[in-house]
């Protein structure tokens, strides 16, 4: 949970009537038709995303009753047979499709708290329309239409409980939960793989559990130990299911979450941990993130200086630059929750990662209000949103390769081993990078490397492959070696491993083979290799001498 420092006010003309029926209300059957058309359109445009094809594939999960108009609903949520859901507004002057996901379900008995706040914001906006008495509203003009958008940047689906809470304070024999503010921060830090260390963080008093949270010592973070998912929600049995992970993997992600919580002075509790959203800014800067990062708000009575177009333009600018956004939605009556905005699409919907084990992560509108005054003035409504923009490391390089492909087969030491890094992408503040391929022994040491390859920040085509070759030393010791793809910025001695192969290069005597293990007793394989392309016929004595040479 994140707290707001002031109570949010609502517009005075809200909730003027609780009995009038507005002609703009949408029935459940009409909403089902809208949902069905939307799902069909998406299934045709992108097969395998939204899988429903008929009205019978939609199951009503929830109809949110209006609190200001009788016999009306603010929105409807439909689960899609085969996975996914879609949320439809109950007022025809609002944005029709408020949100959707192509996986999982939506269960209003197990709703992620950040999504609950987001939906409460939609509810208040829709009820504003339901009770609006003027006749001067017209559809808002479309000010932006994305051609491609940005696919979700965050791949993690982390949460707040086991095992993420393993290093949180204990109260009455229970771990306190991580808190949504810290969970969002931790996922963004994992995305950037930064920082790799933290200074000590002092103790503070936690009011919810009435005890001091002890100081934390300086530490390091090993992001290579962390994984994208530790648990997931089992919809069939309505329970959280643990994925496979090791104890070091769990402890490392728990440590990252704890340091994030300590940095914002998290008010810990086993039932729910909270912190002020704006405390994230100072915390991220204390971890070494850009000093130019900013905290901005929209939709509060004391600070409503951004139009929707301006707000969404800022979001897209961040995402186009590859910067996921620490975001928050606030409910005036219950505070709010932090989450992450990490993508947008051509329909002006934004991808939210709620930090709830992947539950209900999907595409949502930033506002349900789809109308403006006839004179062009935007409707002002106090549905508070907040975000941190410009959050990135001061100097960074993050490079990924989808796969490492290594030429298989037998070789003699001294030959060249060919390797390819496929679908290479990177984000960096450096103008150019150097990459190479290295042979790695069982202890993790780089034994030898290819020539370095220089790639330019602005000239390299993202998603391309990079090829190189390693000359196998004639003195290479027997054993098993993996092949790694490395990058470095300016100092070649500070190479960072991007990826290493699971298959091994086996070396026996003077013979090497990548892939399956082999023994030198497989004489026919050795002879076939040595004779390949040769017109000379070797006798038994000659072959024996040749093998003796290779072994010695």
Regions found by a protein language model. Name each.
Residues 24-69:
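Short, non-transmembrane alpha-helical segments in secretory-pathway proteins
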Residues 443-463, 468:
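Solvent-exposed serine/threonine-rich low-complexity stretches and specific carbohydrate-binding patches
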Residues 58-82, 287-353:
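Active-site-adjacent substructure of cysteine-protease-like catalytic cores
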Residues 94-274, 507:
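Active-site-adjacent structural segments surrounding the nucleophilic cysteine of cysteine proteases
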Residues 491-511:
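Short beta-strand elements
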Residues 375-423, 445, 507:
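Short, compositionally biased P/S/T/A/G/V-rich stretches that sit at domain boundaries
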Residues 89-90, 95-105, 347-367:
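Catalytic Cys-His active-site segments of thiol-dependent hydrolases/isopeptidases
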Residues 186, 511-552:
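Alpha-helical segments with a strong preference for the paired helices of cellulosomal dockerin domains
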